[in-house]
């Protein structure tokens, strides 16, 4: 009888483990999800429904998005406890996990502490931000205190953190301070995304993942289905594997805003295929 119970327990555990790691990237500790900004024309409630329909289970929220779903207000680190609880239930009821918040900045140390308290309460592991350089000492101390990652995001130049060197110059010694690597913005800045990842090795805490191409009359880059642009998606995946990266990877698709879900779903499919083929 005892033997049967042990076998049954093992099978149940194996089934649960298999279910939890049903996508190929799960075993590497990659939390492939979406920035809700990809669905900025919709409420947060609608965004998480769309994220779920794309085959994703992780969410990065952005400040200022109307919550919806019968909940008043906007996504914000200053929202009250009742609103936070309602948002957590909204996400959990969809079977999703909130892993990151950003890109968000705070004006002073007191507000940064409030931002960390918000992240702690919401179960958020990564705060994606582009703070002033002079704020970094107290941000680093708070990151150590709360054990929550502060990931410096790179918008294209002339933003301060457009180049990996500017990130490395300010992160200090805290293991909780590093990079939110946006590979599309590196390409927009004329940088090679694989070279940038190599330069930041050991300091990459999360990703904004996209593929971009410059094929419109105005000569500006725009998002395309992954694997069809200039972001070297396959090589980026291989490099992240080589570095043994672990953390959130947020789809950020800033094109065809009204109906980009099918393109995101196709990109996710490509990503998982490329991951499986990569050594």
Report the location of each language-model feature.
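Bacterial Sec-dependent N-terminal signal peptides
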Residues: 1-24
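Histidine-acidic metal/acid-base catalytic patches
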Residues: 20-36, 40-58, 121, 165-168, ...
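Active-site acidic/histidine proton-transfer and metal-coordination neighborhood
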Residues: 26, 84-85, 90-178, 187-190, ...
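Active-site-proximal loop/turn and secondary-structure-junction residues that shape catalytic pockets
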Residues: 38, 63-65, 104-107, 133-135, ...
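Residues that cap or flank secondary-structure elements
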Residues: 39, 78-79, 107, 131, ...
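Hydrophobic residues in well-ordered beta-strands that form the structural core
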Residues: 60-61, 100, 128-129, 152, ...
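Glycine-rich, proline-tolerant flexible connector loops at the mouths of alpha/beta enzymes
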Residues: 61-86
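Second-shell loop/turn segments in exported
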Residues: 74, 124, 257
């Amino acid at each position: 009888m005892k033997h049967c119970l042990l076998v049954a327990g093992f099978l149940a555990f194996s089934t649960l483990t298999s279910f939890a790691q049903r996508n190929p990237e799960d075993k590497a500790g990659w939390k492939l999800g979406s920035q809700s900004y990809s669905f900025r024309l919709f409420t947060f409630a609608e965004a998480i429904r769309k994220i779920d329909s794309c085959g994703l289970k992780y969410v990065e929220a952005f400040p200022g998005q109307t919550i919806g779903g019968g909940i008043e207000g906007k996504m914000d680190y200053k929202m009250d406890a009742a609103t936070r609880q309602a948002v957590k239930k909204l996400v959990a009821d969809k079977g999703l996990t909130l892993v990151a918040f950003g890109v968000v900045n705070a004006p002073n140390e007191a507000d940064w502490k409030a931002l960390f308290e918000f992240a702690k309460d919401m179960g958020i592991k990564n705060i994606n931000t582009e703070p002033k350089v002079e704020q970094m000492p107290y941000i680093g101390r708070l990151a150590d205190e709360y054990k929550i990652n502060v990931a410096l995001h790179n918008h294209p130049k002339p933003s301060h953190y457009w180049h990996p060197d500017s990130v490395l110059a300010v992160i200090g010694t805290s293991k909780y301070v590093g990079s939110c690597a946006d590979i599309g913005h590196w390409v927009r800045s004329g940088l090679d995304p694989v070279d940038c990842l190599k330069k930041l090795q050991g300091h990459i805490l999360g990703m904004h993942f996209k593929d971009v191409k410059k094929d419109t009359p105005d000569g500006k880059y725009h998002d395309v289905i992954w694997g069809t642009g200039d972001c070297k998606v396959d090589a980026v995946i291989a490099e992240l594997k080589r570095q043994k990266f672990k953390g959130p990877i947020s789809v950020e698709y800033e094109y065809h805003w009204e109906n980009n879900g099918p393109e995101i779903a196709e990109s996710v499919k490509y990503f998982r295929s490329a991951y499986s083929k990569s050594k």
